[in-house]
């Protein structure tokens, strides 16, 4: 224990004397027990503050949990703010190559013990003057049995906060990937004169979803539009096609396209397809990814009018799911998403009321006591909204369930 404390004391001293402008290489150690697409889409974009803070230093990130490797790779591929993404065990990492290590992991205590066992001489004699900081509690939920060993790098965190929201979140899809999505859709019957609407139907919490009857009434309305086909993601190939046919009947179901068992990055290619003209869904990971893809397209010259209509519906958030109180508002999740039309369902005069986030003042954006869960949305209010945005006349729903 004394040896470990001596190593830690030397690292802490290095932290106190760090000069960010002299740092050449930075390593982020990232490990989480659960994976949420939307959380990580936003989180990895925040890494764009690291390079300018460290004056252009090389930035590598190592994902310790290999179980999520394919999904991590989908989110960081082509990201210009990250030089290398690896999936190595600690014994495979050349730690001495780095001047700064940033921990976003619950394993900080295990890390200091590992470094003491493998690098104590280099650390104590000053051969390796590494500074190690913790960002764990900035990005992850605190756990009762989680010991934070390393200090927060407050200057870096302050810089990240000061630059947050200056630019929208981005994902980086290449022209070749976009064309892959176009061809995949053509191979499944989408014609050049047809539009693709994408309906997102899954999320981490059931309360974030519409009632099933409301969802299918909306989908039925969309399928009645001319020259439109609708894409449904069936990531785990759980048999969604049969379920949709049961609800819609064979005739309307023929206008559906199901993507089954595709990789996450391939899903991105479909979201970014040139055929995609509308994306509708709950506050969920793929909606954040869609927003991020088109933010990047527009920054690189796409006319804003060429981006699809994107609509997310939100309501009351589960407090226990969130790291900070601010996370229980739609504004936290969508306030920096200029392309997304964010809807909120709330109670007004004891009746459900649907409002747009962009029309709320600061007090209304931060209010949570009047929010309702998403099962309070009606098909009528959503279809009327969709028809106004799509410039199509709403249909009369003979069997709609309000």
Residue ranges and their predicted role:
Residues 1-11, 133-196, 398-401:
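A nucleotide-sugar donor-handling region in carbohydrate enzymes
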Residues 5-143, 267-270, 276, 285-289, ...:
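Active-site and donor-binding regions of nucleotide-sugar-utilizing enzymes
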Residues 24-42, 182-242, 302:
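Active-site donor-nucleotide binding/catalytic segment of nucleotide-sugar enzymes
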Residues 65-74, 109-112, 206-208, 236-246, ...:
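Short, charged/polar "capping" segments at the starts of alpha-helices
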Residues 72-89, 248-259, 334-342:
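Structural recognition of alpha->loop->beta junctions
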Residues 88-95, 210-320:
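Donor-binding and catalytic core of enzymes assembling or modifying cell-surface/extracellular glycoconjugates
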Residues 102-103, 199, 281:
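Redox-cofactor binding/interface segments in oxidoreductases and associated redox assembly factors
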Residues 291-402:
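Nucleotide-sugar donor-binding patch of glycosyltransferase catalytic domains
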């Amino acid at each position: 224990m004394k040896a470990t404390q001596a190593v830690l004391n030397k690292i802490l001293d290095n932290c106190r004397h760090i000069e960010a402008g002299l740092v050449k290489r930075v390593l982020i150690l990232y490990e989480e027990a659960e994976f949420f697409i939307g959380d990580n889409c936003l989180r990895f974009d925040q890494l764009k503050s690291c390079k300018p803070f460290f004056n252009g230093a090389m930035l590598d990130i190592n994902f310790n949990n290999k179980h999520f490797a394919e999904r991590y790779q989908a989110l960081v591929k082509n990201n210009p703010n990250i030089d290398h993404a690896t999936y190595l065990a600690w014994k495979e990492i050349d730690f001495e190559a780095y001047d700064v290590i940033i921990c976003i992991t619950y394993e900080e205590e295990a890390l200091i013990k590992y470094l003491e066992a493998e690098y104590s001489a280099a650390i104590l004699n000053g051969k390796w003057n590494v500074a190690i900081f913790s960002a764990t509690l900035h990005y992850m939920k605190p756990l009762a049995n989680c010991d934070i060993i390393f200090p927060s790098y407050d200057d870096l965190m302050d810089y990240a906060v000061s630059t947050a929201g200056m630019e929208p979140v981005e994902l980086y899809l290449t022209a070749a990937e976009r064309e892959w999505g176009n061809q995949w859709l053509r191979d499944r019957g989408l014609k050049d004169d047809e539009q693709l609407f994408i309906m997102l139907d899954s999320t981490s919490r059931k309360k974030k979803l519409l009632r099933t009857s409301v969802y299918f009434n909306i989908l039925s309305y969309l399928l009645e539009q001319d020259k439109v086909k609708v894409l449904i993601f069936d990531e785990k190939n759980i048999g969604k096609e049969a379920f949709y046919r049961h609800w819609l009947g064979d005739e309307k179901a023929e206008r559906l396209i199901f993507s089954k068992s595709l990789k996450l990055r391939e899903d991105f290619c479909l979201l970014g397809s040139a055929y995609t003209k509308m994306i509708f869904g709950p506050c969920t990971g793929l909606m954040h990814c869609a927003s991020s893809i088109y933010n990047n397209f527009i920054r690189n010259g796409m006319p804003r009018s060429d981006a699809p209509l994107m609509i997310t519906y939100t309501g009351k958030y589960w407090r226990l799911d969130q790291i900070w109180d601010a996370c229980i508002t739609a504004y936290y999740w969508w306030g920096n998403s200029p392309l997304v039309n964010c809807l909120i369902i709330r109670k007004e005069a004891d009746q459900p009321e649907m409002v747009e986030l962009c029309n709320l003042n600061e007090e209304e954006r931060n209010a949570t006591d009047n929010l309702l869960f998403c099962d309070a949305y009606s098909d009528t209010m959503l279809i009327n909204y969709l028809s106004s945005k799509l410039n199509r006349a709403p249909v009369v729903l003979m069997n709609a369930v309000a």
